[in-house]
C-alpha cells in the first residue's frame, strides 16, 4: 500500500451518511465478512495500534444500491492518504482516442462490447503489514478491512496494475485481439460482419470465471 507510519489520528465518529443509512452499513459488513474481505466484529482492537478510519456510503447509479467509502483523507494532516507519496498514487489511464483508433482500424460496422469486473477493488487483498491502517468501528465493535478499499489514494494505481496484467493475459489468449481497459471496464472490438467480438467476450467471461 506504500503508506508510511507517522502521526495518524484515529476518527472518533463515522460520516453522517453511515448513521443515516445504518441498515446499509449492517448489510455491507455482513456481506464483506462472508467474502472474507473484512474481519470482525471484535470487541477489542484485534491489532495493536489499529488505526480507525471513519466511513460512509454514497449511492451507486443503480437505484437502491450503495457503495461504502472509507474516508482515508480525514483528518487532513493525520490521515492514511496524507502519508502516501505522490509516486504511489500517480496513474496513467488510456484515452478515448485509443478506442477510437481501434474502431477506425477495423472500419465501418465494427462491433463493440464492454464488460466490467464485479467487486473490482474488493478482489485485491491488503498485505498483512498494512492492515493496521484499515480499522473501522461500528456499533461498538471493531473491524479490519482486508481488501483494497474505496477511498485509498493509491487504490486506482494498485488496481490498474492488476487490470494491466489481466488485459495482457487476455490479449494473448485465442481470439482476443483488440482489448483495452479503463480501471475495471474492459472494451472489446471485432471486425464487421464477424463473430470475433462475441467470441472474444465469451472467452473473457470464461477465463475470468476461472
Predicted segments, located by residue:
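Active-site palm subdomain of RNA-directed nucleic acid polymerases
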Residues: 156-209
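Non-catalytic, polymerase-adjacent accessory regions of viral genome-replication enzymes
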Residues: 1-17
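Low-complexity, intrinsically disordered/propeptide-like segments
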Residues: 11, 114, 172-173, 210
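Hydrophobic transmembrane signal anchors and adjacent membrane-proximal interface regions, especially
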Residues: 6, 14, 31, 180-181
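Catalytic-core region of right-hand nucleic acid polymerases
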Residues: 16, 20, 24-160, 207-210
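A short small-residue
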Residues: 8-9, 143-147, 183
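Short hydrophobic/aromatic-rich motifs at helix boundaries and adjacent loops
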Residues: 1-2, 135-139, 175-178
